[in-house]
Amino acid sequence: ITDYDVSYLENSGYESDLGLSNIFAYEEYVNAFYSQYGKKVDKLSFLLGLRYEDSKQEIDQRTTNQFEIKRYSDWFPTLNLSYEFSKMESITFGYSKRIQRPRGWNINPFPRRNSVTSLWRGNPFLDPTFTNSLEIGYLKRYKKFTINSEIFYSNSKDNNVRVTEDTGELITVTGGDDDELNPTLLVPVLETYPINLSENTRFGGVLNLTYTPSRSVRLNGSFTLNNTKIRGEFKNQNFDSDNTSWNARFSSFIKLPFDISWQLFGFFRGPSETAQSRNKAFGTVTSAFQKNILDRKGTISFKISDVFNTGKWRYETFTNTFFREGEGQWREPSYVLTFSYRFNDKNNKRTRRQKSNDLNFGGGDDERIFND
């Protein structure tokens, strides 16, 4: 529920400003049941699953008097196969059907102004996205080295994408009377909102390598390459696009002298492009140190997030009538020093796990800094 009301006192009482107030109620009901059956025969194992879901959404935007009820139901099968050539080598196959429901901010139709020239609004008529996925994986373990690879294919219907349009409104933007490099301009106001396009197909592979030369050193790296094809049309505009993108991760855990643990984590994402937007490449590196003190009852941790201040994403949005550049950053580089003390020795290990959860790298899938 969003309950944000801006009212002004008039002669007859308080009157809401419909341009600023946002009173939005959203309820979602999901009823489901599922069953599973698995078995292992010699080196072959399988797991079959079937889930049924019935969903209901109630969307009530009271400021703009928009009310919508949506219901949908479907079956979601799952199949997982695994064959072990040996304890050190195996191959897997998986099929699944999944549903991705739109989040509340994607369906709230009340406009939100990100800047004087940029608006965002949700789409109350947004449907969920249904995805069928196939995956084939191969795992090979050596004494100090592990290779984990995967090839994947997915096809999504009613894919959720964002579109940007010119509202026709113009805003005067000026750099000041003495700023000759930034003269006064009339800038169009752009509005972005999500829609369902017909189809999204992804095909690619993942390679994950782990190297553990000793108990004091553990190195891990992964690389993902995928090709995405989007097919769809909206308001007589073709949104077809073909794009190949990549991302990479690495992490390391090293035991240093004086009982100091050091962990390093990095994430890099290559450029990507759709019919209306272009995202530039970016990457970020985070580092942390930890030392146990006071007979291992106390722990000092020091974490540096985004060491090189490179965790900024830059993007471009374009059509035949406008071109926009933007830049964003979750947060600037930060430095966190933490001290913890464990009073109960019997629960030391459990406490260390809880504290390490507080020190994560943040953003997307959280990465734990230290493992017990």
Describe the residue ranges of each PLM region.
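Transmembrane beta-strands of outer-membrane beta-barrel pores
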Residues: 1, 41-43, 52-58, 95-101, ...
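Residues on the lipid-exposed face of transmembrane beta-strands in outer-membrane beta-barrel proteins
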Residues: 35-39, 79-83, 126, 136-140, ...
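Outer-membrane beta-barrel strand-turn architecture
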Residues: 39-43, 75, 83-87, 130, ...
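Conserved C-terminal beta-signal and adjacent last beta-strands/turns
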Residues: 224, 241-372
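Surface-exposed extracellular loop regions of Gram-negative outer-membrane beta-barrel proteins
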Residues: 10, 28-63, 72-78, 87-133, 153-187, 211, 215-227, ...
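Outer membrane beta-barrel strand-and-loop segments of large Gram-negative receptors
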Residues: 15-34, 127, 142, 146-218, ...
